[in-house]
Amino acid sequence: MEHDQSAQLVKMANQIGSFFQAQSPSDAGAATQAIAAHLKSFWAPSMRIQLLRDFDAGKTPLLMPIVASALRSHRSTLLPAP
């Protein structure tokens, strides 16, 4: 069950990544910022935490590089306030 949830989160994150990468094809920085902002605004904290945990554990091999970059670059924004 956990694998299915992880795969679904990766699929959704990649869809977001594809959209924002197409919006800013020559500006990866803008795309990663937009991806992170979208995840922060529209994903529940539990979803963001799970995606980051799976990413840290190496369980997201199908994650698009632009999404992985967004997770690395904007990690502190994606985590809920303590």
Segments (PLM) and residue ranges:
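A domain-level signal for the structural core that forms small-molecule/cofactor-binding pockets
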Residues: 1-82
